[in-house]
Regions:
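Bacterial Sec-dependent N-terminal signal peptides
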Residues: 1-14
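C-terminal beta-sandwich/jelly-roll accessory domains of carbohydrate-active enzymes
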Residues: 614-697
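Low-complexity, Pro/Ser/Thr- and charge-rich linker/hinge segments at domain boundaries
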Residues: 217, 227, 290-312, 319-323, ...
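Short, conserved helix/loop micro-motifs enriched in His/Cys and acidic residues
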Residues: 331, 336-373, 475, 479-484
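Alpha-helical cap/lid subdomain in secreted, periplasmic
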Residues: 46, 72-210, 453, 458-595
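Surface beta-strand/loop "capping" patches
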Residues: 218-219, 225-231, 579, 583-627
Length: 697
């Protein structure tokens, strides 16, 4: 029985419609002070009103498996549910089947037992409406999470879906309202009163089809930019089973139907980049209209504070920074509170817990000083340079960096559960994140230290800032982050590939990712090795060691401030990103060049040794630097490095005197945390920090 039949029952039934909630301790309301008032079935009753009667038939510890340690079909609640003869059944079982006494022994019987349970409940009337629920979450703090529970949980979730599909039953997933809210599951299993309310609202929507009507992602708005050059996916929310109509420019119409969860999605034809468009979305008398919509290339700019640094905070604002350009646009996601050294007030803490850390925002054009001054300086200069080189292509930047954020906050909870689950529990007190990150988070949540979320929490910013962008369409990603992870490069080496996979799965398969190498600062000696790690994490075809493709790196050590982690000069960073993008993504020649040094050979010529890499002379860009070349360190067999100033001949070729060049075995370039290295390629891009062997030819 679907939504149409339900509407008929509501209209004509003399008796209330009976809804039986079948389940375990989560349904029963275990740990709640007043289950008769706070459990999700009790909340559901209040939401549904007098036309319904909701029965709570949950039994703590119950298993779906008939041979489990506490089979639901042997519990008194099962007999009561049979006798009650409900019109609708909502079944939520399986959590206790993850127990090692159950799933490893009887997994093959789960499907049979689930079908038998459904048949028993509906034997008087096989047409009764049955909704089966995939399980509410088990969090990483569960005592058996790492010893089988997560694997069993995933297998049971998949089996429940197969059962629903085979019987053509309505399927809901009670992980959806709770998954990114671990603080609402204090014992890893059972929801708090607030968690039960979230569950009840979700089940209410599934029962009635009332999902609040037509709504769209906040990304949709006047002035938005959609990715050009391909069909565009438009997705949104409506009431369950509703017809949705989309009009594009009044001459194209597209239709979709929402599913029982109110979700709908459609593909529309690609849009012209030459003019603006209007998109109108309608459903059940509701109407949303978006004007001045462009098709262009959409880039995500993310990371931490050096990406977040605003244009009006920099020292290299140029007059073109405020040049009017309606076809350069940004969707700037800014936090409701900066992670400064302060205790956040209660209202901020509540919003953070509710995943409302980003302010409401709207699309902006580069036409007003007050707009562009608030943009990320790096992102603005990147977009400005692309617009100058691609005048026929609108460029849009979606900006969501957060100052101080560690990389793990941008990795999904799901990915961390399956790879680094220990990071998800008591993260404030574990050394995965650098001490500054953990201490700053504790300062921010000092007024509510228990059960409080923070944007630095592993997985938080993925759920808050990345996942909501799913399906929107992007050209590529700019990533400037690492300051908060540089003290643990071995962990970053594990996390960065996970982030790449998450971003690409969410935002677009094989999207190019352009990373910014950390600049330099005297007080952070660990940055030397971290910068080299960042090079290793680029793609193999770029000279790195990462098998993931399309990952590129821009050096910035020459833009550094020896005393400030936030260099105030951002023009070069954004411009270099744009030039690298023009070369790699847009295949423009003579934009960026080669910046990677490999092993070096020394070729003797009289009293000099010339430096050769990859078969060619290493040359300086004489238009930028005419004197000695700084930044090289050499070592003999003892492995002790010493700095050397290299000279250049009239052709810019680098050489060193024979007295210095004899007996060398290795070199480093631009290695110190703060360096004045000054070797540039022919396009004015600094050569990346490097180390390698030296041989003689």
């Amino acid at each position: 029985m679907g939504l149409a039949c339900l509407a008929s029952l509501v209209s004509y039934a003399a008796e209330p419609i009976k809804v039986a909630c079948i389940g375990n301790s989560v349904t029963a309301g275990y740990l709640l002070k007043d289950p008769e008032w706070e459990s999700y079935p009790s909340v559901l009753q209040r939401l549904l009103g007098p036309n319904y009667e909701v029965g709570n038939f949950g039994h703590s510890g119950a298993t779906l498996l008939f041979k489990g340690h506490r089979p639901y079909v042997q519990m008194p609640e099962f007999k009561k549910a049979l006798d009650w003869d409900a019109d609708i059944f909502v079944i939520h079982l399986g959590l206790n089947d993850t127990d090692p006494r159950n799933w490893p022994n009887y997994a093959s019987e789960f499907k049979r037992d689930y079908n038998a349970l459904i048949d028993s409940l509906t034997h008087k009337n096989p047409m009764k409406r049955v909704i089966i629920a995939q399980m509410s979450p088990i969090t990483a703090s569960h005592s058996r999470f790492r010893t089988g529970t997560l694997q069993y949980f995933d297998e049971i979730q998949a089996e429940i879906k197969r059962i629903a599909d085979a019987r053509n039953l309505e399927l809901i997933n009670l992980s959806d309202p709770l998954y990114n809210y671990a603080h609402l599951l204090p014992d890893a299993l059972h929801p708090t009163s607030e968690g039960a309310i979230r569950m009840a609202r979700y089940v209410y929507g599934s029962l009635t089809g009332d999902w609040g009507g037509l709504s769209m992602s906040p990304y949709y708005g006047d002035g938005m930019v959609l990715q050009r050059g391909k069909k565009i996916r438009i997705s949104g929310q409506a009431d369950g089973g509703a017809r949705v109509t989309v009009h594009v420019d009044k001459d194209r119409e597209y239709l979709a139907m929402s599913n029982h969860l109110g979700k709908w999605s459609m593909l529309i034809d690609s849009l012209s980049t030459e003019r603006s468009h209007s998109i109108t979305i309608m459903s059940k008398g509701q109407r949303l209209q978006y004007n001045n919509v462009l098709a262009g290339d959409v880039w995500l700019a993310s990371g931490q504070s050096n990406m977040a640094w605003k244009l009006n905070q920099t020292k290299d604002q140029r007059r073109e920074a405020y040049r009017d350009d309606d076809r350069l646009r940004a969707y700037v996601m800014q936090p409701i509170a900066e992670t400064n050294k302060t205790a956040w007030p209660e209202d901020i803490l509540t919003q953070v817990n509710n995943h409302q850390y980003y302010k409401k925002t709207s699309w902006q054009t580069a036409q007003h000083l007050e707009n562009t001054g608030q943009w990320s300086a790096v992102a603005y200069h990147f977009g400005r340079a692309l617009r100058d080189s691609l005048p026929d292509v609108p460029i849009a930047i979606v900006c969501n960096p957060i100052g101080g954020a560690p990389i793990e906050s941008f990795v999904s909870q799901r990915t961390l559960e399956h790879n680094l689950p220990d990071m998800l529990t008591k993260w404030y007190d574990k050394p995965y994140s650098m001490p500054w990150v953990r201490e700053r988070a504790k300062e921010n949540i000092a007024l509510r230290p228990q059960g409080q979320r923070h944007p630095y929490e592993p997985g938080y910013l993925y759920a808050e800032g990345i996942e909501p962008l799913h399906g929107l369409g992007f050209k590529g990603i700019l990533w400037y982050q690492g300051e908060s992870n540089a003290d643990n490069p071995s962990l970053y080496k594990q996390l960065f590939p996970l982030l790449v996979d998450d971003f690409r799965q969410t935002l677009g398969k094989n999207l190019p990712i352009y990373t910014v190498q950390l600049p330099g600062i005297s007080s952070r000696p660990e940055w030397s090795e971290f910068r080299l790690l960042q090079e290793d994490l680029t793609s193999i075809e770029e000279g790195g060691k990462n098998a993931q493709k399309n990952i590129f790196l821009v050096p910035t050590y020459d833009c550094a401030d020896s005393l400030d982690v936030h260099p105030r000069y951002k023009y070069a960073v954004g411009n270099r990103l744009a030039r690298l993008v023009l070369q790699k993504t847009y295949h423009r020649e003579q934009a960026y060049g080669q910046t990677k040094l490999g092993d070096i050979s020394l070729v003797r010529h009289g009293k000099k040794y010339y430096l050769i890499s990859d078969g060619t002379f290493i040359k300086q860009n004489q238009a930028l630097v005419k004197g000695d070349i700084q930044g090289f360190e050499f070592a003999h067999a003892d492995g002790v490095y010493f700095p050397v100033s290299l000279e250049q001949d009239k052709k810019g070729r680098l050489f060193v005197s024979r007295a210095i060049g004899d007996g060398l075995v290795s070199y480093r370039y631009a290695y110190p945390a703060y360096t004045k290295a000054n070797l540039y390629n022919q396009y004015g891009i600094p050569v990346l920090p490097a180390f390698g062997r030296i041989d003689y030819k």
